Amino acid sequence: VRRQRQMCIRDRYTAVDARDLPGMADVDSSLLLFCSEIRKYCTVALSGECADEIFGGYPWYRDPKIRATYGFPWAQSTKYRMSFLNEELAEQINGITYVDQRYQETLKQSDILCGRTKEERRLREMVNLNMKWFMQTLLDRKDRMSMYNSLEVRVPFCDMRIAEYMYSVPWEYKDYQGYEKGLLREAVKGLLPDEVLWRKKSPYPKTWHPKYRELVSKQMEELLAQGNEPLLQIVKKEKLQELLHEDRSIPWYGQLMNTPQTIAYLLQVNYWMKAYHVQIQV
């Protein structure tokens, strides 16, 4: 599916309408477009949400350095995100403390048996963190983007019987042959071609074309030039100006939201505030 530039802009804001909230920018809109194409041919589809959570597909399960990092592994930019808020809001919202409290609460809910090694305990915590937080975000995204197109998407890996069973499977089995979701790959061997079965995991697509960054940067420059947009009521203008020249390696959220997606997300926030008549009071 190929889209013209102006259509990409429209898709990004249509994704906000589908969520009723700002989301994951073009990561959302690409799924929205994908679902609209599928709907031309069928009304029901299957999707793999929850497989990464229960079979250990994410990089933060597999990379020891990321795994050992304190906090939600897909949200390591809380301090950076807080730096965008204007001073008045920042004084009222202690985002760093709030996120840390939710993180600690979730760790305490992890069901860990006595006698487990430090690594085994951490991997069990990671499963719980992903099931309770990251998976919920992806399920909501899939539901919103698909149903906006009247497409029913079913998620078989979310079946309670599978999820409960896999929760207790030791990591060395999930990590079969050192592959992401190795146990799942082995289970369906013979059902899929080997080039599909054993290919390296790839995250859901975002926009990689360099023109996309040019496009969203130009939109942000226009927003800053107008000076009266709702986004500027809550975000520091100078931080938005700095963002246009940044190239951060740590995502704003998840695995894919780097600088172009961060700019696009903030444009979504501005659109959402205008379209939904959002007013901020502190």
Which functions belong to the PLM regions below?
Residues R3-Q6, R10-G115, E119-M126, R141-L192, ...:
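ATP-dependent adenylate-handling active sites, centered on carboxylate activation for C-N bond formation
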Residues M160-R161, S217-E222, P260:
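ATP/NTP-dependent adenylation/nucleotidyl-transfer catalytic domains that generate, transfer
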Residues N130, N149-V153, A225-E229:
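A ubiquitous short alpha-helical element
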Residues N130-L138:
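Core structural elements
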Residues L192-G254:
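PAPS-dependent sulfotransferase catalytic core
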